[in-house]
Amino acid sequence: MSGRAVSNSQHAQQSFGSGPQLYRDVAELHAVPSPSHGALMDPSHFDDFAFAYQGLPDQPSLVSLADHAHAHASQSPTAFPQHQAMSGLAHNGLPFGALPAGNRSQSMDGSDAPPDRTSPASNALEDSTTDEFGLASRSRADATDLGGKPKEDKADATPAWSELKTKAGKERKRLPLACIACRRKKIRCSGEKPACKHCLRSRIPCVYKVTTRKAAPRTDYMAMLDKRLKRMEERIIKVIPKSDQEVASSVTRAVVKPAIPGTVPSNKPTKKRGAEEAFGPDLEAWAKAPSKPKIDGDDRPSSLQVQEAEENKLQHEGTEALPSKEIQEHLAEVFFDNIYGQSYHLLHKPSYMRKLKNGTLPPVLVLTVCAVAARFTSSPLVNSSGPEFLRGEEWASHARDICTRRYEWPNLTILTCLLILGLHEFGTCQGGRSWALGGQAIRMAFALQLHKDLEYDPSGRTGPKKQLSFIDREIRRRIMWACFLMDRFNSSGTDRPMFIREDTIQIPLPVKEKYFQFDMPAPTEMLDGQVPHPASPNDGQLADARENMGVAAFLIRAIALWGRIITYLSQGGKDLDPNPMWEDESQYVKHLNDVVNLEASLPSSLKYSAENLDVHKTENTASQFLFMHICLQHNILFVSRAAMSARKQQGVHDDFFSEASKRTFSAANQISELLREAEQSRCFVSAPFAGYCAFSSTTVHILGVISGNPNMKPTAEANLTTNVKYLHKMKKYWGMFHWMVENVRTQYRNALDAMRAGANLQDRAAQSSFLQYGDWFNRYPHGLSDAEFMDPATHKRKDSGADGVLEAKPELQSVEEYFSTLPTPQSVEHKDTIRAVGTKRKQSAKKQAGLPTQSGQHLESMQGTDADSVSGAQERRFSGGLGLPSNSYNPLAVSNAQNPAFSTAMSPMSPANMTAFSHHAHTPTFFPPELLAMNFGQGANGNIDPLDRQLVFGGYSLDASTGLGGGQDIMSGLDWDAVASGAHPDGGLQGRRSTAKAGMNGQAAGMADGAGLSGPEASSAWFMPFNMEPPEMGQDPGFNMGGIDPFTGVFGGGGSGLATPNALGGLQQQGP
């Protein structure tokens, strides 16, 4: 106590001389006698004084001491009871301003006065602006009221908490825990227990609140967002079905930052948990739980496992529909002999045949090959009563169902089946199916990345990448090029754009066939001529890329060029060309130069010659070799004929048109030469596009026939004979060629009429419309049906479900529309006859099937057959030949008012009705009801006797007395019977001037250059076999009427040039 008093007095002395006010206070103090320093500090004076807090640090400040010149002055001891009473009041909770009057300070003279500055009570309780020395201040000088450490405590001992160590073992510099009062006032707590200095000074309870939860570490804004995102993800995961959880496993999850070290939560549960504690177990269980049961040790993606499971099913699905092993092997040989390499180079024959014998081929591939090859076989095991092009439909239906169910999982097997099925549907006149299958194949090819030349298998299997062999890489390339060719074939129409762009295919062209068969790697060029992987001579490979390309590579280039020509001529390219086609800068001239340069760029081994053809025969590629050259010539024909439409335009040069005409007729003749060479070499060119090339050549030959040029006409007639014969052969295997043959028939008839009318050949060539190869889609969108032969007037329009979102059509009809829908009188007259014929078809069919082959029995059956049964049998036979129901067609229901589009429909007069659909079966003549209702007289005007007419098919001719004109006949000597049958006529025609002119390459065709046929002997004199049913005798159409063309209702137009049916499907030209 004495030490503190001394120090305090010294502090007072230092502060004493700080201002003039202090001198006045000192004078007053000296005026009052005070006890000595020893008497003041004598402990005897404090016997009855009890301190409330012994360690009160600011105790000296409660006692006013004055000392001047080292002399201590103080109040009398009577002041201490006052201080004790003040302390008691303060301790009892009384306010400091409520002190009693007796406790107030008294003046020195004993009278009441205002509190003096020297009174401790006034300093501490009443005057807050002055201290005990009278100095003005805002607060205590030592700041002890704020809990600060007094200045004299610097020498005190360190607090007890400083002796504690941190968890890291270091000395603690910060207070581990502050009391509640210091926290609220936000001041530093001394940390003593049970009460800190501030609480002791303020005389308030000191409470330390100990919590079990540690303060969460501060996190930044992004960490907070991560936690919120994590909580939202957990809520979403709980809603996701278990079947879809394998997809969620591959989704990137939100990442919560790990906790700061040292802040791991305690074991006691709290209200809020950390991210690791809240989500850790659930996330771990969710990540480890399998979505579906997997095979032990199989860690591949579930989608890949599903695809492989489907591929395993593909190895067995369709087994029940397979034919016998013998038929499978036979049809496989037929496929590689007649289909492989013509249009598509699909499948590797050594691998296919080896797998077929081992039974490791997928059944769907075997069904597809059998379906498309069945049309070309002559085996009795595969033969059916229907037409050839419908033989494999049963196998195709099973393969089609299997393929369409697996469009989600693309693989090379399904892709190959789609391409082959597209070709099959092309032959069965299923335009919609072929178009859809081709589009699906193209999408699947791009999904398998076939348009890229990859070295490793891109199927996505886990594990080490499998390097593709040369055969596998070549198979991938050929499948992609097959998709490219199918796109060009199917998209050659006016309204069907092409899907595959040439620049998207970054793969080389196929190698030669012998290299592919014998596994000999060789580099080839790309479509634009670049060599992606050139080989040096030291690599052991054939270094010349152009010499390594065979027929397949240049066939692809020819079809690609044809696609560009189609785009220019038929799909708007010509309209976008700013230059006219006869200018050198035009796109037309560019395409023309490309056509000529492509043929000139052929290697010496691929140029057309007899020697090269023999070489390709030994390699079994002669048909492909001929097909490639047919396509090259067809490009020249197609692009040259387009120039004829520009003859009447302004500024066209005559040389431009004449050169185009020469190239057109030269290319048409070359196509016929190639077809004739294929027939003589017994190399059947079976590609459907080859038939279209023959059709295009035929349209040019028709113009040559009516040209009147004596040098051009014989060649055109001979080539026309070859083309028509080839088209008749092709329509047995591809159904759409019935339509093309009928179109040729119509064009020929119209050309004859135009020539007799005095039309110019050049005008005729410019006005003639050109059929596109892809137009058959619109002709046969869903196969053959009754609508092909139904009278449009009897067809009632019905609302289709596909038009549900379109505008509602008006239900009212005008008078003209109403009368146009009424049936013709002839159809009403023969309505009962139609019903009677329909009921007798089956009986007639049975009767025909049971006809004996002996002549006597045949004559008896002919005499016992009535007209109705014969007519019914003929109708049934035609409908059955087309693969239709027996009641699908009736020629009597067709009226004379035909649709103009009907002129290209397949007519029962088509010669293929006998040769393609049945053996030695007679087809009915397609006469309108008006003609059948007439009863023509059978006068003695030179017509053949009825008995002879029964035996001589086509023995009806026109007489000079009919008055059908006496003009020159363009096809005067063309014997269409010989054209269709392939027979060579052995003599001239009697009763007229005739000659036998040899065709090109020594093939003779009956021709004559005089007037039209006339006289009774003007028929082909071809006698029917005795197992053939005779024609109907009830309505014998004798052509002895003047000025009447009985075929007007058939061909849709008048004219004297007639084309009548004969035994083998030729056009029997007749005229006056």
Swiss-Prot record:
Alphabetized UniProt keyword annotations: DNA-binding, Metal-binding, Nucleus, Transcription, Transcription regulation, Virulence
Keyword Flavoprotein among UniProt keywords: no
Gene3D superfamilies named among the record's database cross-references: Zn(2)-C6 fungal-type DNA-binding domain (4.10.240.10)
Phenotypic effect of disruption: Leads to a reduced ability to colonize the root systema and thus in a reduced virulence.
GO biological process: DNA-templated transcription
DNA-binding region(s) from the entry: 179-206
One Gene Ontology term, aspect cellular component: nucleus
Pfam family, one: Fungal_trans
Family matches, as CDD domains: fungal_TF_MHR (cd12148), GAL4 (cd00067)
InterPro entries referenced in this protein's UniProt entry, alphabetically: TF_fung, Transcription_factor_dom_fun, Zn2-C6_fun-type_DNA-bd_sf, Zn2Cys6_DnaBD
One Gene Ontology MF term: zinc ion binding
Keyword Transcription annotated: yes
Subcellular location(s) of the protein: Nucleus
More details: In contrast to the FTF1 gene which is present in multiple copies in highly virulent fusarium oxysporum strains, FTF2 is only present in a single copy.
Function: Zn(2)-C6 fungal-type transcription factor that has a role in conidia production and also in plant colonization. Acts as a negative regulator of the production of macroconidia and is required for full virulence and the positive regulation of SIX effectors. In addition, FTF2 is also involved in the regulation of class II hydrophobins FOXG_02746 and FOXG_02748 likely required for plant colonization.
PANTHER family, sorted: ZN(II)2CYS6 TRANSCRIPTION FACTOR (EUROFUNG), ZN(II)2CYS6 TRANSCRIPTION FACTOR (EUROFUNG)-RELATED
Protein name: Zn(2)-C6 fungal-type transcription factor FTF2
